[in-house]
Amino acid sequence: MKTFLVFALLAVVATSTIAQMETSCIPGLERPWQEQPLPPQHTLFPQQQPFPQQQQPPFSQQQPSFLQQQPILPQLPFSQQQQPVLPQQSPFSQQQLVLPPQQQYQQVLQQQIPIVQPSVLQQLNPCKVFLQQQCNPVAMPQRLARSQMLQQSSCHVMQQQCCQQLPQIPEQSRYDVIRAITYSIILQEQQQGFVQAQQQQPQQLGQGVSQSQQQSQQQLGQCSFQQPQQQLGQQPQQQQVLQGTFLQPHQIAHLEVMTSIALRTLPTMCSVNVPLYSSTTSVPFSVGTGVGAYL
């Protein structure tokens, strides 16, 4: 028994020594939990700090790039290109003022021709007829043939009626009234010429038609086509007369001649005073319905 116990103790001692030898040879196997992985983790945290340091410089580099893009705002040359366009529009406005010379022509007519009430012109219609019939050969030497064909009795009647009505008009308005009478005579002559021109147009158009068709058209169209032609011819004439801007330069010169002759003839014939200037003040005869009143 003693021997057995001795051998058992020896075996225990041997196993313990063997275990100590093994642990001494492999020291990491004694306490694996005592390993310190913390220092490598601590080393990772300082490695994360350079990352924001690397990210910050690109942001700082992008900011100057934006700042460099912002000064690319030279829009001033565009505004300078728009500004020279405005002075170019001023010559267009100057051309518009130069283009319509008819407006200046109309203003001259309005200044020369007064507007008279129709009732006043009807009152002085005998004076108008007296001038149209050329009762006084000295007044219109170009129309002596027409004046010779008229009876002296009608001229005498027109003269008496004219001399009865002309003194009733205020002296301040006589010049304007006489000028309006001569203007109405020219417009009436222009209207008659316009009607004659329109009546000749259908005759020229019908020259190519056969004689049989012409005879039938004459029989059927004398009652139907002549009247509409006259009506159609009168409507544009009234528009022209109302506008009063269709007088040609030679007609204006003829108007001045007729007015000067009428201003010499009517005052001496009726023994009235007519001032040789247009009345600038407002008179009851200077308010009318338009140039159409002169007909």
Swiss-Prot record:
InterPro entries reported for this sequence: Bifun_inhib/LTP/seed_sf, Bifunc_inhib/LTP/seed_store, Glia_glutenin
Pfam family name, one: Gliadin
Cleaved signal peptide residues: 1-20
Region (Disordered): 30-61
Assembly and oligomerization: Disulfide-bridge linked aggregates.
Similarity remark: Belongs to the gliadin/glutenin family.
Protein name as annotated: Glutenin, low molecular weight subunit PTDUCD1
